[in-house]
Amino acid sequence: VGVDNTRASIGMNIKPGQTVMTGEGAEAVYVIGPDAFLQREKTKITFEDSAGAQAMRIVTGSVLSVFGKGREKARKLQLTTPTATIGIRGTGCYIEAEEARTYFCLCYGEAEAVPTGDPKQKETIRTTHHEHPIYILATGGKMMAPATVINHTDAELTMLENVVGRWPPFHGQGGSRY
């Protein structure tokens, strides 16, 4: 696991403009402010901050993320993949970014998914427990297609929320489905 060209270490701060990379067989859990991330193997993510908006560019790979809400005012958070731009608010989500498509599961919260190939096909999504996973495609007539829940669990979401002192909204509502 590396941050820019430096081997990552426990307690290392990640700042806007930096890139976090994981190699084969590596995973990383890290916290930036009220947000926590589980970055899977072979993933490259850059964090940016411009004009008061925070951005996370998933260049390639997979990441499970939980985002806290702003205290004083609404936070502007934007996720970018090769095929989509996703605006998020108080959200837990899982992304697998590839060149031709992005898998996006809004585990809970609210997001606006905008396909890069046709921004007019944007969709606002609201979920409480994995109800609307989608693929966002790079090309084609219909840019978003239904998907199923893959490669992430409620236990992982709970762990990430606990790392930042919270519980996921589905906590205490019966058994886990994922």
Outline where the language-model segments fall.
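Flexible, surface-exposed loop/linker segments and immediately adjacent secondary-structure boundaries
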Residues: 1-178
